[in-house]
């Protein structure tokens, strides 16, 4: 906005000012004497202002010369020169205007009046018209605007003729007012106001310059100070680091020289280790654990607490009985005739004893030392102690018999003395409190104690004697070790002296005689233990089980609920653990050759199950044994369903799996097979009856009876593996070498069975199985299966002028195009490829696009549930699939062909092609079996495998 006062420094102009009005218009503005107006820039024509201006001019020049050397610098001097030139031109311009005529002067004054007076009117400020045509007023305004430092664009300065304003027509027309802009310097000022304005601006610039200079200087000082401070800090850190390094070096030297520093360092290391263990323990506690594992641990801890309470009560009862027996023995010893006789003989022979003491004193000390050393050795040796604990229970009975026969012999006394010392040490060990373990896996440390070892020995011996006396029985009386025999010989030699009888009588008088009632003590101990130990249904006590330390548990600790099925090499039962009440699966291994040792098939199964731990493989918990070694059981997690029986139930209800469920099951199966193959394990018996499904939808592979580890290079194994319906064609054609592709073929058959709820190749024999495979997939040849003609079965057939029926086209797409997608067909064809080298691997099948297309595999937890037949107590119906081969030369018959009709001329008419001619009997059904063979083969030979009755 333009300053309303008429100047930048706020000076007010009145109408009485000489520079405001022209001479011809004094009367026109007389009534507005009190109003305030803005003085336009114009030159004064009065003569009195000349000396004053000259004086100011000289003062300005002096001031300019004075300030030229001041702070302003070259920029201020240049600006002053510019303004000085402007003033000289202005004076020259107005000097020419004064020489004009009065009319021209009046017109000029009128022009200046309109230029100054009409500008502040509101309509002229609000409306800004377009730039007018070039005129003198516009030129004059822009000329002043440019010279006063405004931002308007410079215009070209035109020189007008001297008689421009003196024209006749120019005075009649009104002068056009130029477009005003709201500029700070839009109004022109006189020389004094301009001087003051310039001075104020210069002072302001100088002040800003000085202020900026001081600010920069202060900032530089601050930066320098901070740099100095930072450098000092870095220097201090450098010195601290160097001193710390030197101190460390000195400490290392002290540590190597002084053992105290080493001890201190070890103590610090231990403290750090303990802190680290505490942190790890806190992290482990924060990590969420499996609920089943926590429940199992809680049950084990509860069983541990219960056993601890039983031990405490048994210990208290035993202590009370000991006190009672001591009181009875003291009372009976005081009145017994043997005690009286011993006291009398001791009184008579007291002088003899004193005399003979120096002679045998050294021998007696040596014997005592040897006995103490023997006792310490026996205590430290766990194996000898476990054997002697059984014999110590029978020592009183043996001593009573020995005293009747050899009452005066010193040998019996030495054995009695040794048994007394051992029994005392055992009683002291019983009284000591045993440290209880912290974790369930370390509960078995209790078994290492002498008390627990003695208790478990006695209980197990009693239970074994009650259950089966004809089975393996532990001999309770065992021979003493060579160390004890040597001590006994030394005792006999040392005690062969006249004073030995007196010493024995004195010992018998001073010491207690716990062997007087040994039978009662043993009965009471066993009775107290029987009251505290848990028993099974028949009343037979169960031994304490501590995993990780003790051997195999007994199968009697499990309650058999019902039989589930019979596997390849054993029968599976559903049972309940009597300690934890958990439902488990017990698989009994067949021990047909137990006299020759543990069967190799059972060892392979246990080994592969322990090596192949995976979420989709059955979990082995432990191995338990029966009363005899011919009964061995594998304890596994119980899974509710097997897929064979489940699919039969669904088929009876006219149900089938959804595509997402098929993908979920196949994906879990492929994961398990891939894990086995990564661990160099062949399952060799994959089928739906060996696939288990839990209520949570988790598929688990079971029955590892035919599983075997393989290696590189691949060895020759028996081809009589895998159940017939899921057997690969290379096995059916007696290939001597096979590997993981045989499991992949079985997975392909199972995948097809998931899709159609029926077996894909339900052959009755190897011949029928091959015929079904070739009919479904087409007959192979050397082009699609390199090395096909080199297989033993094919080579023998060709040598005998026999061949298979040709099926050129695969029927797989025709049968499954409505049951799965194109990607599903591609996966099925990849799994059922003839050439084992071109067949998909389990890892490659997992990456197939079938599992990535919609619908995606469902989550196992979303799987529907069905009631398990085994839980209802009903025996599960046997699956309709054939049993797997038992292996070796004792394999059983896998199936039989259809009955063969013998036609006239004793020729077979079951569709078999003899030579190259078809027999037309029985309707000419030569395509029913598709196998071409020579004539004269009996029915029994056709039913045998694996070589199709051909001797290779």
From Swiss-Prot:
Domain named Protein kinase: residues: 558-851
Location of the motif Nuclear localization signal: 51-56
Subcellular location, record wording: Nucleus
Annotated active site: 685
Record carries keyword Kinase: yes
Family: Belongs to the protein kinase superfamily. CMGC Ser/Thr protein kinase family. CDC2/CDKX subfamily.
UniProt-recorded name of the protein: Serine/threonine-protein kinase PITSLRE
Organism: Drosophila melanogaster (Fruit fly)
Gene: Pitslre
